[in-house]
A protein has these predicted regions:
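Extracellular/periplasmic juxtamembrane helices and adjacent flexible linkers that interface
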Residues: 44-47, 294, 301-344
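Short beta-strand->loop
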Residues: 53-59, 131-141, 155-162, 172-175, 196-215, 267-281, ...
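A bilobed periplasmic-binding-protein/Venus flytrap-type ligand-binding module shared by bacterial periplasmic
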Residues: 170-176, 282-295, 311-312, 321
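Ligand-binding pocket segment of bilobal, Venus flytrap-like solute-binding proteins
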Residues: 200-204, 208-275
Length: 344
């Protein structure tokens, strides 16, 4: 019987999305660091002058770690020992939260990185640390794409740093429009009434989903959240969104997806990529640094240099705040950020 069961059949029986499974399998097979991660039964105890922990958007993990490993070796020759654990964002943050829940700043990593709003914004968990002013980032010049008259990603309180963003855009199935106009903005998508029960949202992608909810609420309040609920049709993983074809009534008109995944869309596809004219909602990649470790500054500088900025940007797929890096954006590629007043 086992010989007659295909992988596709097994996934259907288990209720596992095929596209999402393929993506995770490919990441596992291509991740040279995964052999180490999977072999450990217990979390390894990190040692060093500077400890770095965090999560990165999945496509960024391998290239960042390759550059970081080389940096660590170079710093070891200079007498600086760095211990780190950086995982893919889809693996969750429970393993970092246990350090924070201890309320002991000595158990918290010197540098923490988080993709999205999931980790650093629980007032109950961080209140004591903020009260004691445990975190501080040195002010720096930002890339002009993120420091201009329309947007500023510099934290005025110098608690958080943002090193890159994951932009969220529309993927419109032109075969399903049925006479409707292609939505060109979040305001039109949410409030025109033309797209009720027509939009796919990646509920399982917490980084993106949290960014959607936080940003929409910060701009339009409860009415914005109600509007989001009205347009919602189904949850699709971004990898599945780019494969949707045809004019099936079960297919959404619009899929809200990270910009990175739109690079997988075929030119001959009926799927049209739309960068909202009121800005792509961003899920920031945040960095926090403990104030009392001077040696951590050297490591923070790694994430701010132009070579790493180019890796983060990935030719504009994950635009970076690092000064001098060309994010290869069009003039009309703006961003929508919840704002520091809202965060603080």
């Amino acid at each position: 019987m086992g010989k007659m069961v295909s992988l596709n059949m097994a996934l259907k029986v288990r209720g596992i999305n095929k596209a999402a499974f393929e993506e995770k399998l490919n990441m596992f097979l291509n991740d040279e660091h995964s052999a180490v991660d999977k072999s450990l039964v217990e979390e390894k105890e990190l040692k060093g002058d500077v400890i770095v922990k965090g999560v990165l958007p999945c496509p960024l993990k391998i290239p960042i770690l390759e550059a970081f490993d080389k940096f660590i070796e170079d710093q070891k020759n200079n007498g600086l020992d760095i211990g780190y654990e950086l995982k893919s964002a889809n693996l969750g943050i429970d393993w970092i939260e246990s350090d924070i829940n201890s309320k002991d700043i000595d158990k918290v990593a010197d540098i923490m990185i988080s993709a999205g709003f999931e980790l650093f914004f629980d007032k109950e968990k961080f209140s004591e640390f903020f009260k004691n002013e445990s975190f501080y980032v040195e002010p720096r010049e930002f890339n002009k794409d993120f420091d201009n008259e329309k947007i500023c990603l510099k934290d005025p309180k110098n608690i958080y740093d943002i090193i890159a963003v994951v932009p969220c855009v529309f993927l419109v199935n032109e075969n399903n429009l049925n006479g409707k106009e292609i939505p060109t903005s979040w305001e039109e998508l949410l409030f025109s009434g033309n797209y009720n029960d027509s939009v796919a949202i990646p509920l399982s992608d917490l980084d993106m989903f949290n960014a959607l909810v936080v940003t929409i609420f910060s701009k339009w309040g409860v009415e914005g959240i109600k509007a989001l609920a009205k347009v919602y049709k189904k949850s699709l993983h971004p990898a599945e969104m780019v494969k949707k074809k045809g004019d099936s009534k079960n297919n959404p008109i619009v899929s809200v997806t990270p910009y990175f995944f739109t690079q997988m869309v075929s030119r001959s596809s009926a799927l049209k990529v739309v960068w909202p004219k009121d800005g792509a909602i961003v899920s920031p990649v945040f960095l926090m640094t403990k104030k009392d470790n001077e040696k951590a500054k050297t490591v923070v500088e790694f994430f701010k240099n132009s070579s790493v900025g180019k890796i983060l940007s990935s030719n504009g797929k994950f635009p970076t705040t690092v000064k001098g890096v060309d994010n290869l954006l069009e003039d009309n590629n703006g961003f929508l950020f919840c704002g520091w007043d809202y965060i603080h």
